[in-house]
């Protein structure tokens, strides 16, 4: 069985109720390719609201969570809370969490482990900076990030989607070519095959997340090892529907 295409729209810290209503109406209007799993990453304060208005063919994700079920962690939310409002997904290890908020591989792994134990599905993000790419360290960096996740994931790979986001291609005006993206996805699969198992390598879905737009989505979708996208800014716009449908 082929890997089901999966497109995530990460709204980041954007949207008020009016804008969210517009985005959701656009998703309802679609039409969205029924062979694609669609997930939107929503600011924590709007998770419950979006859950009540989103169409059945779109899943909702939190954009972050902490590594404990409850406690004295002011400003954080737990997987238990996310599940309690009917949400089944969380995005963890996003490059903005790593760079702006200083989250290290080990913390991301602890969060992933706790989210999976709590029954959430996880979009786990990895990716290198411009400096790392220009010093030829792309594979070294993404393999290091992936290695940290392996013990956290254990045997729960069916609840994981990996997202490769070249940090250097986000908001910098530089974009990864489909071939550059495919090369990294292929290398990740080879690493998984060698270090986890052939079956995980074949089955796990790897999204691409580096300035995906309606203009470049089709060509990226045609790459053998790209199984979907994690879309940022474009997920707030009507063109998100085109990106979801890029694999048709």
Swiss-Prot record:
<dbReference type="GO" id="GO:0006096">
    <property type="term" value="P:glycolytic process"/>
</dbReference>
<dbReference type="InterPro" id="IPR022896">
    <property type="entry name" value="TrioseP_Isoase_bac/euk"/>
</dbReference>
<dbReference type="GO" id="GO:0006094">
    <property type="term" value="P:gluconeogenesis"/>
</dbReference>
<keyword id="KW-0413">Isomerase</keyword>
<dbReference type="InterPro" id="IPR013785">
    <property type="entry name" value="Aldolase_TIM"/>
</dbReference>
<dbReference type="GO" id="GO:0005829">
    <property type="term" value="C:cytosol"/>
</dbReference>
<comment type="similarity">
    <text>Belongs to the triosephosphate isomerase family.</text>
</comment>
<keyword id="KW-0312">Gluconeogenesis</keyword>
<keyword id="KW-0324">Glycolysis</keyword>
<dbReference type="Pfam" id="PF00121">
    <property type="entry name" value="TIM"/>
</dbReference>
<dbReference type="InterPro" id="IPR000652">
    <property type="entry name" value="Triosephosphate_isomerase"/>
</dbReference>
<dbReference type="InterPro" id="IPR020861">
    <property type="entry name" value="Triosephosphate_isomerase_AS"/>
</dbReference>
<feature type="binding site">
    <location>
        <position position="12"/>
    </location>
    <ligand>
        <name>substrate</name>
    </ligand>
</feature>
<feature type="active site" description="Electrophile">
    <location>
        <position position="94"/>
    </location>
</feature>
<comment type="pathway">
    <text>Carbohydrate degradation; glycolysis; D-glyceraldehyde 3-phosphate from glycerone phosphate: step 1/1.</text>
</comment>
<dbReference type="GO" id="GO:0004807">
    <property type="term" value="F:triose-phosphate isomerase activity"/>
</dbReference>
<dbReference type="GO" id="GO:0019563">
    <property type="term" value="P:glycerol catabolic process"/>
</dbReference>
<dbReference type="InterPro" id="IPR035990">
    <property type="entry name" value="TIM_sf"/>
</dbReference>
<protein>
    <recommendedName>
        <fullName>Triosephosphate isomerase</fullName>
        <ecNumber>5.3.1.1</ecNumber>
    </recommendedName>
</protein>
<comment type="pathway">
    <text>Carbohydrate biosynthesis; gluconeogenesis.</text>
</comment>
<feature type="active site" description="Proton acceptor">
    <location>
        <position position="165"/>
    </location>
</feature>
<comment type="subunit">
    <text>Homodimer.</text>
</comment>
<dbReference type="GO" id="GO:0046166">
    <property type="term" value="P:glyceraldehyde-3-phosphate biosynthetic process"/>
</dbReference>
């Amino acid at each position: 069985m082929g890997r089901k295409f999966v497109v995530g729209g990460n709204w980041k810290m954007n949207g008020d109720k009016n804008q969210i209503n517009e985005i959701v109406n656009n998703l309802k209007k679609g039409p969205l390719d029924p062979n694609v799993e669609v997930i939107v990453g929503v600011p924590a304060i709007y998770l419950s609201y979006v859950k009540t208005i989103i169409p059945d063919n779109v899943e909702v994700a939190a954009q972050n969570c902490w590594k404990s079920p409850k406690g004295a962690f002011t400003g954080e939310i737990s997987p238990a809370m996310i599940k309690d409002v009917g949400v089944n997904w969380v995005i963890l290890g996003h490059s903005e969490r790593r760079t702006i908020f200083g989250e290290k591989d080990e913390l991301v792994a602890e969060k992933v482990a706790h989210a999976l134990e709590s029954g959430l599905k996880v979009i786990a993000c990895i990716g290198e900076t411009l400096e790392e790419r220009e010093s030829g360290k792309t594979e070294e960096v993404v393999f290091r990030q992936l290695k940290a996740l392996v013990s956290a994931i254990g045997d729960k790979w069916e609840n994981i989607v990996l997202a490769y986001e070249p940090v250097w291609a986000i908001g910098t005006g530089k974009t990864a070519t489909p071939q550059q993206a495919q090369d990294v996805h292929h290398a990740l699969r080879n690493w998984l095959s060698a270090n986890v198992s052939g079956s995980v390598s074949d089955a796990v879905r790897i999204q691409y997340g580096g300035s995906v737009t309606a203009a470049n989505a089709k060509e990226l979708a045609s790459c053998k090892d790209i199984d979907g996208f994690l879309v940022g800014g474009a997920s707030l716009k009507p063109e998100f529907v085109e990106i979801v449908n890029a694999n048709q």
